[in-house]
């Protein structure tokens, strides 16, 4: 339920040092983007502006002018995010190319 609450509260992305497996899976399944990047978490402070590219895994701290590398999302996860969740992704046929 935590990813649902965060998404409903308007949080656009969570970057953390690590996630419990259940939180990670639930987040992806509802189309809530999360990334693991210890260095970005250590440097980020309140009111820092961050920019994330999920296709490359690049996290930019605009405030500090620094870049960090997290693991990029594979295409099927990007499709889940674009469709705002796994259920919508299946309904829209967006995973068909990965199911063959």
From Swiss-Prot:
The gene is leuD. It comes from the Bacteria. GO terms for biological process: L-leucine biosynthetic process. One of its GO terms (molecular function) is 3-isopropylmalate dehydratase activity. Pathway: Amino-acid biosynthesis; L-leucine biosynthesis; L-leucine from 3-methyl-2-oxobutanoate: step 2/4. Belongs to the LeuD family. LeuD type 2 subfamily. This is 3-isopropylmalate dehydratase small subunit. SUPFAM superfamilies: LeuD/IlvD-like. Pfam families: Aconitase_C. It catalyses: (2R,3S)-3-isopropylmalate = (2S)-2-isopropylmalate. Transmembrane segments: none annotated. Keywords: Amino-acid biosynthesis, Branched-chain amino acid biosynthesis, Leucine biosynthesis, Lyase. Catalyzes the isomerization between 2-isopropylmalate and 3-isopropylmalate, via the formation of 2-isopropylmaleate. Heterodimer of LeuC and LeuD. Its EC number is 4.2.1.33.
